[in-house]
């Protein structure tokens, strides 16, 4: 009899939504009611299976890969079905399960092609799970690409008036970025005496400096589109502005996290030598994301576009955390991803609830609806408070950890750290201004003459209340007791930070901060000096 710990849990978790999606066309259903219950049931069952497997068999104190499965799939091209989970991927798997399940529940009123809609949702769910557990570069790329097609169709069919433009822009950006994954991956796989696509093996290989730097840059571009990083972000406001509420929940809650996860897994963990050179660039890009995203959010009159630019700003903290080279900074980056996934999903869902009542996303055409929708107003306010990192909410903990991480880092000069912290703080100050302004325009004051409400405007319904509460409760829980989530990945982030620090320069008795400052201010160092900066001090 098979020991349950040896059961292929990850394969089952990935395959369940995909196989269930393939069965949707044969389900007898005329009005779409059976299909939506079926989709919700499958998503919930998969999420429950995930929780049960991790609860019983996952070792939270270990930084090693667990639930390891590896089978030759297409040996002719070196493609293996190689999956595993560790502290970095496990919390993001749980986030993916929660967001996708709630997004399907949020799509309860979809009547246009319901079979296709729920089928695409389940296929996308399966591919997202595959991205977070893939341990073969080709498998990772396959899952990354499969996920693009459902997102494109969900936007182009069930989106807003400019849905085709937004969907086309999304697919062009992300498909073009995927080329960089393939090129960088092949450069690493074929470098050296052995050819391998195993991610762990790729991390142990020695690469010529030029190949490693170019591969890092390629991954940075590819994953920077998904995160997104300025100036590769312009697809996101359009996609959010036109996507349905469930689509926006998944875009903000899961898709952006795929970019952050991949940056940690590939750029920082697999290519630590190149990370030495790119870390200050990540810090600068993080600051730009924060300030630029906050400033652009001010200029938006569309509610969803304002939230989209807010997401760009919040993802800047992930970049700064990775650049800090500290355990608390990397841990804060992971926590920020989980927190933002929950917060953004709640705000985009509540925006959909508001749009359903007001039939507009333009804030200058709203106003005063807090009087007729007090429960929605209260829930939206709670989500906004979480987004502006109010103490007691998860966002506060994540951002604070990133700030402490970069401020206490010993790899940068004091002046560089001061500039990063101060400019990031400017973005933090701007966040409550544009979020509170958003609340005022939508819920306070008098109703706009251009707002044409139905004769009866219902407040938040039980289904909508359940979805929002399912997102807000973990936000508050993590804010009050961060160890609730950090204990699942602390061992892994400590290992990643320590591994990355091994290649930091400690040469001729000099401190890392002085040499790092030398790299940053004098990029044309002699070749011998550059070589010494990336070697471990003996």
Curated annotation (Swiss-Prot):
Keywords: Membrane, NAD, NADP, Plastoquinone, Quinone, Thylakoid, Translocase, Transmembrane, Transmembrane helix
Domain of life of the native organism: Bacteria
Any GO MF annotation of the entry: NADH dehydrogenase (ubiquinone) activity
Annotated catalysed reactions: a plastoquinone + NADH + (n+1) H(+)(in) = a plastoquinol + NAD(+) + n H(+)(out); a plastoquinone + NADPH + (n+1) H(+)(in) = a plastoquinol + NADP(+) + n H(+)(out)
One Pfam family from the record: Proton_antipo_M
Main location: membrane
Mode of membrane association: Multi-pass membrane protein
TM ranges: 7-27, 37-57, 88-108, 116-136, 137-157, 170-190, 210-230, 244-264, 278-298, 315-335, 336-356, 388-408, 418-438
Biological process according to GO: ATP synthesis coupled electron transport; electron transport coupled proton transport
Location in or out of the cell: Cellular thylakoid membrane
GO cellular component, as recorded: plasma membrane-derived thylakoid membrane
The EC number(s) this enzyme carries: 7.1.1.-
Disulfide bonds: none
InterPro entries: NADH_Q_OxRdtase_chain4, NADH_Q_OxRdtase_chainM/4, NADH_UbQ_OxRdtase, ND/Mrp_TM
Keyword Manganese: no
HAMAP family: NDH1_NuoM (MF_00491)
Family that this chain belongs to: Belongs to the complex I subunit 4 family.
Function: NDH-1 shuttles electrons from NAD(P)H, via FMN and iron-sulfur (Fe-S) centers, to quinones in the respiratory chain. The immediate electron acceptor for the enzyme in this species is believed to be plastoquinone. Couples the redox reaction to proton translocation (for every two electrons transferred, four hydrogen ions are translocated across the cytoplasmic membrane), and thus conserves the redox energy in a proton gradient.
Protein name: NAD(P)H-quinone oxidoreductase chain 4 1
